[in-house]
Amino acid sequence: MNKRAQIKEGIFYLGEEPIFLVTADYPYYRDDAGNWDDRLKKIKNAGIDAVTFYTPWRHHAHKSGDKIELDFDGRTQPNRNVKLFLELCAEKKLWAVVKPGPYIHAELTFGGLPDWAAAEKGSGIEPLVNNKGEPMLDPFRPPGGYGRPMPAPLCKKFKAMTKEWYRSVYDNLIKDSIYPKGNIIAVQVCNEGLYSNGPAAITDYDYSDSALELYKKFARRENVRAPRRLSAVKKISDLRDYLDWARWQSEYMRLVYTEFSSVLRGKVPIVINLNPPSEGRGLDHWLTRVIPESWPGINYGFTNWLRPVSEDRVSFDRYSLLSKRKRGINFEENWGFSKLYDYHFQYPVVCVFETLLAIANGATGFNVYTAVNTASWDDSIDCQHERPYPDSSPIKEDGSLTKKYEVLNLISLFFEVNGPEFLRCEPDATVAWGLYPPYAYLAAWDIPKEDWDRFHAEPVRCGYEALDRFQRIMRDRNGDFQIVNLETASPAELKRHKFIALYGGFFMDGKTQKKLASYSSAGGRVIFIGEAPHLDEDFSDCRILKKKCSRLLKMEEIGDIIGCGNKKLHVSDPETQVWAYDNPDRKTQFFFVLNLSTNAGARHFSYEGKKAAVVLPDKSAAVIKIKDGKIDSVFIKGINEMNKTSVVPEAAFGKDRFKAKTACDVLALRQGKKWQIKISA
């Protein structure tokens, strides 16, 4: 049997067994090496499958004259002995996800890059520059401090330095420890885009000479130019430069990911961790750059770092889109930072709500970032942040355990028992949003309506005032949906959906029009909001979809046509948010229930005619597994520490009931006629 680690369609597998991956980050480089064994033991006992950890270039590499010395075994400093750290993980039967950067952020000086990687004058390293020719400076420098120029990733010298760093990490740490020989199951390349700037505008980078030279080859047009600002669009052909530059953004990221990780290709799964889109028009910029279907061998993953989604609906929506863009593992969920980011995150209920929202929207695993508070690092890697780092993790800096640890153990055990079966269930796929990337390419430029009027076209929309509004309409009806890339999806992928809706534009390439027309002829329904395409990619007449689609004048009409999509699920209260995953062959369902209201009590829904209810405090969450029509497993967060409210957790499905004996957080697993119950009070 093939037991190698792999990721298929966003799901982690060992051999042919799907595994819901529960991971925890431990910044060993910020802790005393003497603490590692104890902390890893406690991480394992919390139900964690794998430890994720950055290997900071700045921490392990030191320059002596012109010579760079690397330390992976602690000969210069004990907490540089990452080889020992990896061995201790293996001893505890913890898998490992290694994150070599090169830029890692992690609140380290210069994002963990060594000083000699800065694009200083005379260094021979190009800076990353924006449309104004301004170099990007270290985005997380101390207030009023010197900002080192960030290197252009595809600059010949920096690229060679990075590949040499990756080769060193591979040779010294990864090569002999790849699963099944060792415990390394994946390697993460880069961090939240390039420099934690994944959501940046398409004119923010990269106008360096090295990038522009590659762009010219990519565009394959004579006299191609990289637009630095929006000029008046006087004729339809003026759009080509804007389309090409926007299309280049995703290809640019593919080049960075694949160049940096070339030594790893085909040897270990490679993952990335993308951060959420910005508000408003930022969604179009993000959709332009994030096209994972075009990154073969690079597996989609994501982070969070928004305001608490239980307290802020905009963050709720942005995080949902990030989780839903493509199935993948959540590689950073804030379980530890309340002082540095938002005070709400000191409370376990906030972390649980975020975690379950991501899973409900498609995450195939989650990460506790970080599992451990640390307090033993030197100023060479961070002279800015106070100790401990972070401030409210499940395991404190002295090794003591917290309420978060107890709750984490309950969630981890739920997915340890039920993870494979959950991953064999499917979310509702009745409705899909048709993502047509070229619409994002133009929408990101925010072209004025008067320019569109010159060639009698409606403004093109994709994310902002399109996908975001569609999601809000669907969630207000408790409707789930999937996102399908119309350019890359196969006919079989389209066939999974009864409805495909999108905000229309005046053009669409002929190949995609034909694909959608075939989908429509086979019984699917294509719904354009606004304009339907009548030109192809060359802006020539092409009306393949004219009689193969429906048109709506207003987005608000969409709900009346498709309802909530899933005819099995009914929820009357929009403040009770429910997601259903189903495997009819196994007679198994999972329900994620999130209470957005400020009221505690029963949250009601029905599925296939069976009434269901979960008793929750305000702003809390639960997950329930149903097997053969009965409650099989349940996790209910019955305590809201932030608002000092609590309930006696209870769940009902049809005539079947589970009720705890006291106000608590509870995990209940059915074993025959009895329940195995664990609580945190």
PLM-predicted stretches and their roles:
Residues 29-45, 282-290, 348-357, 489:
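Short, acidic/polar
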Residues 158, 163, 170, 177, ...:
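Carbohydrate-binding surfaces of carbohydrate-active enzymes
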Residues 1-50:
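N-terminal carbohydrate-binding accessory modules
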Residues 36-120, 261, 507:
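Aromatic-lined substrate-binding rim segments of carbohydrate-active enzymes
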Residues 27-34, 59-62, 68, 73-79, ...:
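Acidic-and-aromatic substrate-binding clefts and catalytic sites of carbohydrate-active enzymes
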Residues 20-24, 51-53, 96-100, 185-189, ...:
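Hydrophobic faces of well-ordered beta-strands that scaffold small-molecule active sites
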Residues 78-92, 96-98, 117-189, 410-421:
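An active-site-proximal structural segment forming one wall of the substrate-binding cleft
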Residues 65-75, 91, 102-146, 178, ...:
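Aromatic- and acidic-residue-enriched segments that line the glycan-binding/catalytic groove
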